[in-house]
Amino acid sequence: MNKWSRFKFTPNLPLGANGERVTGSKAHIELSKEAAKEGMVLLKNENNVLPLAAGSKVALFGKGTFDYVKGGGGSGDVTVAYIRNLYEGLKLQKEKISIFEELCDYYRNDIKKQYATGAVPGMTIEPDVPAELLSKAQAYTDTAIISICRYSGEGWDRKSVIDPNNKALWDYEREMTEKSAELFKDGDFCLSVKEKEMIDTVKASFKNVIVILNVGGMVDTSWFAYDDQIQSALLALQGGIEGGLAAAELLVGDGNPSGKTVDTFAKSLDDYPSTYNFHESRNYVDYTEDIYVGYRYFETIPGAAEKVVYPFGYGLSYTTFDVETVSAGVVNSNCTSETNKLYAKVRVTNTGKFSGKEVVQVYIAKPQGKLGKPAKELAAFEKTRELQPGESQLMILTWEINDMASYDDLGKVKKSAYVLEAGSYDIYVGTSVRDVTKADYSYILNHDVITEQLSAKLVPTSLPKRMLADGSYEALPQSEPVDTDYSAIGNIDPSLTEGVAPCQRAIPYFRFADGMAKNGSHDIMDVVEGRITLDEFVSELSIDELIHLLGGQPNTGVANTFGIGNMPEYGIPSVMTADGPAGVRIAPEVGICTTAFPCSTLLACTWNPDVLEAVGRAGGEELKENNLALWLTPAICIHRSPLCGRNFEYYSEDPFVTGKLAGAMVRGIQSNNVGATLKHFALNNKETNRKNSDSRVSERAAREIYLKAFEMIVKNDNPWAIMSSYNMINGYRASESEDLLTGILRDEWGYEGMVTTDWWTCGEHYKETKAGNDLKMGNGYPDRVKKAYDKGAISRSEMETSVKRILGLILKLD
C-alpha cells in the first residue's frame, strides 16, 4: 500500500486475516473481558462466600443489575453492538448457578420504562422492591447480590454545582449536573436514600450478601466494609462491553480476582483533603494539600490513617500468597551516581488452593530532611504470572536512585533542583501500601546530592499556603498576578469557543491534485523520498498556508473529532483524530461499532503493563482500520479528588503507577504506526468551569505529582502527541503557558512531538502557538493569527516551528 493511501478514504481496508475486520471483533471483545477480569478488585470476602459454589441459587437486587454502566460519558463514550450487563453475564453461568428470575423481570421492566422516559445508564432511580417478590426471593435462596452503579462524564463533577455565570455550558453538561443533583443530594460518592433502603431490606432478609460496585471511581465503601451482614464485595468498576460477564465469571470462580486499588478509599468524602476547596470558587482551586495526595496524605499526616477503609494497592484473592524479600541493595556499585539503581529480589509463593496472581509493590520511606516527604512512595511494582498452588516465582524489581529525589522550589536545600537529602532511604516490600515489610537493606546518604538543577517554572502567585508532613501549613510567597487575558489584537469573540466546526478550506475528501494554487514548488512526497528536507519544504509555504496548517480540519470518512493537514495541492493528506479513553469513538449515526474496553481506572487496577499494551495495540488496530490517525488517549490526570467527573478516564492517585501503565498503552497504540495523545496537560482535575478555573499549585506539587506521569511517558515511550488542557495553571492558560509547553515539556524533557489544544479552548490562537502549542482544535482562528502576524505579535519562525511538528506527525503515518 502506498503511503497515506488510507487517508484517501477509499473503503476501509480490513486488517484481519482472510479479509476480516478487527474492529469490534470477537478477539478484541474477548481481550476487553479478560482485561476487565484482571483489574476487578476483591475488597471483602468473609467466610469465603466467593467464589459461589456450584449449584448456588442467587437473587439479584439493585437497578445496577440491568442499568449497567460500561464506561463514562463525553469523550470516553464508545458506540458498541451491545452491552453485557450483570444479569446477562450470570445467565451464561447457568450450569453453575441459578437466578430468581421473577425479581429480575421486575428490575428489567422498571429500567426499561425509565430509559423510555429519557433516563441514561447509571442515572436511573432505585425502585422499591415489592414485598411479595422479596418473600419469594427469600424462599428461593439465602444468597443475594446487590449491584450499585454510578455514571459521570465530561463537563460535570460528582457533587453537582452549576455555575450560573458560565455561559459556555453545553446543554448535556447542564442537564446531567441537574439530574445528578436530583438523584444524589450529597453527591454520588454516597448512597442515595433509595439505595440505603434497598440495602437494609436485603441485609435483613438474606444470610449471604454480596456487593458489586459498577462505578467509575472512588465511592463510599464503609457501609459494607464494617458490616458483618455483608460478606463479600467486588470493585468491578466500569468494565466495557463485556463488563457484566467479566464480573459474573469471577463470582463463580472462572478466574481469580487479582486487581489492586489504585486509589485510597476513605470513610467519608470529607476525609479527602481536596474536598473542602474543590468547589470553593468558580474561578480557582487552591491545591493546599500540596504533594500529600491520596495515600501520600493518608499514610503521612497525623490522624489520617484511621480514616482509610481500603488502602492504596489493596486487593484480595481466592488464594493466599507468601511474599519474601530475599535481598535488596544497589544493582551495580561501580556505576556512577547518575545511573545507579536499587533492587529488591522477591519470592512469591502461592500458599492457597486456587491458582492466581499477586502484585509485588516496593515503597520508599525517605528521610524527612528540610523538605518533608510522604511516609511512603511507590518506587516499583510487578505482577506475577499465574501461579498454581504451591508454585513460586522469583522477581527482581529495580528503580533509579535519582527517582527518589524531591523537588526544592523554595531553596531550603537548593532552589529549583531535585535533591536527595542526606539520611536513610528505607525499602518496604509487600502487597499494598500498608501490607509491607521493611527490607534489611537501606540506602544511606551522608550528604545532600543535587540530582538535577533546573529553573523555576509554573511559580504560583496566589496560592496562600501548603500542607507540610506534620499536617501544619507553611505560607507561600505571593506576587502580583499577570494579566493573561491581554491580546495584541483585541479580545476574542466568545462565539469562537463555542464548538464551531472548521470552516476554512472545507474539503470533504482527500485528493492528490493540483486544483489549488500553491506558493511552494515542491510536494510533501519530496520530503518523504528525501529530495528535500522538511525545513526546506516548510520554508516555501506562504504565511496563509502556515496558518492553515495550525488549525483543525473538517471531518472526513468516519471521523467526528476533526483532522489535521488537508493541503491536497501539496499532497498533504487530511488525517483524522478520534476519541476516546475506553475505545475508538465513532459517532453512532455512522453505523460502525467498535470495542468498548474497560475504563482507564479499571485497566490501571490490573497493575499489569502487558494488559495495557495489548489493549492499546487492539485499539490502535481499530483506529487504523477505520482510516483514523491520532487516538486522543491516554488521559492521565491524577485522581486528586473523588469529585472529579472524569476520574473514570484517568488512571490513579499515584503518578508512578499512572506513568508505567499509560506508557504501556502508548506503546501498544503506536505499534500500529498511528499516534497516541497524552492528555490533559495539565492539572485538569475538575470539570465544573473547566475552561476558566485556575489550578493554583506549588511548583513542587506540580512536578512531583501532576506532571510526573507525563514526564515518565515522554522520556520512555515517545508519544506522538500531547493535548494541553482547558484550565489555567497559576494564572496562565495551560494552552498559552510557555513554562509548561516549552520550558518543561521541550527544554527539560526533550519532547519533539506535536502539542494540540483541547477542543475549542478559550485561549488566543497566536499566543498558544508562541507558547509551544502547535495545533488548535477543533479549528484554528486564521484571521486572528494573520492579524497578530501583521502586527508583529507572532513571527514566521514561530509558526514554522509548529508546522514542522504537525507535518512531522503526519510523516510518521504509513
State what each model feature region is.
Residues 1-435, 456-814:
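Glycoside hydrolase catalytic-domain context in secreted enzymes
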